[in-house]
Amino acid sequence: MILAIDPGNTESAYVVIDADYKISSKGKIDNAAMLDVIRRYIPACRNVVIERIASYGMAVGRTVFETCEWVGRFTQQAEELGAKVDYVYRLDEKMAICHDQRANDATIRRALIDRFAKHDLRTGKGTKANPDYFYGFAKDTWAAMAVAVTYFTQRGRGWNDC
């Protein structure tokens, strides 16, 4: 089981998922609360995977640096608790999930729905009465799922082409 994190400057999204893609927990929470999530899920999650910020030659602002600081805090917390920390970059996600570096949030989300949705093939969420795989997912939670899928793909878990 892994804890996949999509970090942000004030809030971060996470997915706790096993190698069979069964989701145990997910959400978007305040970064201080994410430190508690890390404590709660280790040692059950031996691996923590965090999306790492990459420089593409553009000027960045305060929020990017604050996000980088939180990545460091999450890493330190997980390592102090004995977890192995790995990182994936956004470009890795695009290539692992869509096989195209031009992919965007919408195409990544579509590929995830195509792969995992059981009956709601439009949104992958379903309804409260009939939930599908992605029931309860919001924008940043999709990004955390992309982190998890990329991690498993890079380690030979496999992925069906989009």
Regions found by a protein language model. Name each.
Residues 1-162:
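Phosphate- and other anionic-substrate recognition elements at nucleic-acid/protein interfaces
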